[in-house]
Amino acid sequence: MNLGTPEEPDWKPITVGISTTETEIEEEAEDYYYMDGRGTPESEPATQKITRTFTGHRKIGDPVQDMVFDMMMENLDKRATEIVEYYDIIPSGTPNGKKYPATVAVQNDGSGEAQMRADISFSITKTGASEKGTMTFTQNKYTWAKSEDLRKVTV
């Protein structure tokens, strides 16, 4: 998650205290009926909503959790962010992820029983197109680089 700005990003992993992630994809389709098809619909996807939910335990001091539960939860105007989903097992030099704009929603802020750890849950919903690229981690810092266009046309 980008805790900085698009111009000066500060990427931090959404992993500390997180035990489970779940992706929900909601799609709606439009059906079109034509006489030459004798009333059989042609169906096209019309909308898509992709949401990833993170659940686990509250870890005060983690930059991502502190941003979500201390700032974003209190200020609805601060819910927009950028996300990079990447796979660190892909060899270097190869695009390993995608970056996209998203909004954050809080489902559980850590309330619960006194003898238990504070259960948390928040989600990110994709709000725009993805761009492919490479996330690297060197010198204790995450860096994102957009991929060059891999589609080369030969005539």
Residue spans for each PLM region:
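A generic structural signal for solvent-exposed, polar alpha-helical segments
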Residues: 17, 38-40, 92-93, 106, ...
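Mixed-charge, glycine-accented linear interaction segment located at domain edges/termini
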Residues: 102-155
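Solvent-exposed edge beta-strands and adjacent loop segments
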Residues: 1-55, 59-60, 103-118
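Extracellular/virion structural assembly segments
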Residues: 38-101, 132-137, 141
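Extended aliphatic helical segments
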Residues: 16, 64, 68, 84, ...
